[in-house]
């Protein structure tokens, strides 16, 4: 053995030495390698002879990584064959114990051939010997590590035993040069551990890891742990990928179902969708919002004093067929729940459209009372086939009302399209209409406090349509018959079948007359030009009804007093100038009213019924005037009483007749309005008792009115 070391020094010059040496030892390597002192190394070297070619290539980088120890690197590879290169390398640090140290290096030599991880430790061990000399005491632990490696390789216990007799001096060696012993202890575990990992072929990995942390012998232990954890890591990665795939599949299924559900709930026909330029601004009177917030429209009003009229208009009540949930959408398509009904469903809801369920009848058709499966009461409006209102008004209601949600506007629940049938389903308002309570036969006198509340509520609903909807919505048929009341006499403006979207780029909308005579603004009767100020005029007529208790047109009044506006105009001027309104106020009230409120309503009505449209106030100003306790603001728009152009009743009548012919092509008018409760066309035709009679056809009133004027 000593001769082989002497001949080995020349070998370090080139890495070619290992192959020849392995060939020389090949006689003992296949089986006899166990007899040689470094039996375990040859055993390890025999399997990887094909690998040495790769390790050198991979092994070359480490030298570059650690420039100081490259020479030892070259010396370390040759040792595997002859075991002598180590003796030459250890002498520099410690000359006396070179021979005993020779045997430990052989143990280090096999690792480089198997996985090339041990060579780095040897490379870095030469530099630390001085520091390691002080660490001579810790030498004993290495021997303790030797038994575990022997136990770790199941087939290698015999090899260590044969190896120990040869290098019997190895125990003393660790005591003297601490540098060499640490390497041998590290090497055996590597040999034992590398016997398993070679299958994983992690040659590149161990090389880099020991090169970075070679000084500590503990670095050799992690590689085996990593080799064992590699399988676990792959298993965990597989589970993670599978779990991710399952979650992704579930998400796709959920999205597909959600999309299908949306498609089912969507409108079946795009023509019923609101225009793209239609938007709604929320205000303090919407569902679930704070009623004390100021009005959000231009020239907004403050509603903090709503309670002065006897009730808070910001309160939310859910009785009487109303759904005022705080979660109701601000500008959603008919809120939540079912929106599309089949004709069969509506037939069941209305009990086959039974006559005893009829709430009223107008020019468009009948209104039936119905009950949904959840017990909610609804009003089903059925359009007459071929009626003048027809599909245009139906589409308008579906497009507009479905987007409008305000506590003073009747909400649309759903709709039905079946062949030629067109039906709308509204929330049911149980307490009839303002017309019913003001002019109904045998009805008790409507209290003044309730009249004020109704005026303010309906004004807020109209102001919302004019100010907070863009483009603004013009009702076009404001009248007492279209103001519904709930059990607490909260006003709900209804009948949007006549509403039109008024584009902000247009100053008016020309269309056929559908409003009720007596509420028509002068400019509307003259030319058919429609603006939001036309609604203001009609609302002024409603205020006059509340003040006086009279109908807008009453053929049983004395000659020249049939028209409410014509009769009230001089009295309004007198009341504003003198403060005496005794001739205007409904005598049935018997002076049970608040004078300030009466005077404020008179001023507001006078401003609303001005002959000149531009000189009328906006609805937002009307609300502020009616709902203010002190200063009512400039409701006059800078105009004093009498400054507006004079109201010519004769010209108004001529304009009305002319426009009626232009709109309908004949001197007749159709039924108008939505009626409920005790009122029907048959009852109205009986009307012969002045204020106690109910009129629903304006044809008779206007024909008689015009005949008496001319």
From Swiss-Prot:
EC annotation from Swiss-Prot or TrEMBL: 2.7.11.1
Entry-annotated residues carrying Phosphotyrosine: 426, 524
Residues engaged in binding ATP: 359-367, 381
Tissues expressing this chain: Mostly expressed in roots, especially in root hairs.
SUPFAM superfamilies: Protein kinase-like (PK-like)
Membrane protein topology class: Single-pass membrane protein
Glycan attachment sites: 191
Signal peptide limits: none
Xref: SMART domains: S_TKc
Protein family per UniProt: Belongs to the protein kinase superfamily. Ser/Thr protein kinase family.
Protein name: Proline-rich receptor-like protein kinase PERK13
Species per Swiss-Prot/TrEMBL record: Arabidopsis thaliana
Organism phylogeny: Eukaryota, Viridiplantae, Streptophyta, Embryophyta, Tracheophyta
Name of the encoding gene: PERK13
